[in-house]
C-alpha cells in the first residue's frame, strides 16, 4: 500500500513539475523582446481567406488565408534571437465553404482575387504536337487516351473528355487509371459545356468535379470576356498562339486548371 502511495505521489510531483516548468517557460517567452515583436507584427502578415461564391448549383472556389503561429514562429527564431520574416510559421485559414464539401455543384470559374486564368483545349491524336505548350490544360477523348499520347504531353495537365463529352463509369475507370499513372496530375475534373445532371452524377460518383468554362469560343470571345479567374475552352486551336500572346499581353497568368482552382 505504501509503495502505491509513493508511486502516486511521485506521479503527481512529476506532473506538477512539468506543469510548473511549462508555466514558467510561457512567462519567460511572453517577456522576451523577440516574442513581443512577433506578437506586435503578426497581424501585418495575416491574410484573410476569400470565401467561395455559391449560387444555386454552381460554385466559384474560395482561397485559403493564413495567420502567424506565434509559438512556432518564436521557436523558429529564438536560436538567433533576431526577427526574420522568412522564419515566420503560418497556420491556414480556410474559406467558409470548401470545394470538397460541394462536389455536387458545377465549377464555373476560378477565384478572381488574382490575375490567373486557365486555357482549355480538346486534344486528339491529330493535334497533340500543336497543343503541347506550357500550362495549357488538355482534355483528351477516350479513344485518344494512351500511354504514348500522354507522354507526349508531359508539359500539360491532362484529363479525360469521355466519349466526346459523354462520361460513364467504365470510361472514367479506364482513362483515370492511365492518366493517374502516366501524367503529372491527378484526373479530378470532368468537362461539360453546360449543366448536365448525368455528367454531374457519374463524375461525382468517381470523386471528380465538373467544370463548365465561363468562356467558350475563339479569339473574339476571349478578347471580349476574359477576366481574373476565367476558365476558357477554345472551340479549335487555329488561333492558339495568337490567343496565348493576347492573354499574356493583358497581364494574365495562364496556369493549369488545378492551380487555378486550388483553394
Question: Where are the model-predicted features located?
Answer:
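N-terminal hydrophobic targeting signals that begin at the initiator methionine
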Residues: 1-2
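Hydrophobic membrane-insertion alpha-helices, especially the h-region
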Residues: 6-22
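Generic N-terminal initiation segments characterized by hydrophobic and/or small/turn-forming residues
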Residues: 7-10, 31, 254-257
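Ser/Thr/Pro/Gly-rich low-complexity linker/stalk segments immediately outside membranes or between
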Residues: 24-38
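Non-catalytic propeptide/linker segments at domain boundaries
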Residues: 34-114
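Active-site beta->alpha N-cap acidic-glycine motif
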Residues: 77-169
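Catalytic domains of cell-wall/extracellular-matrix polysaccharide-remodeling enzymes
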Residues: 145-155, 159-263
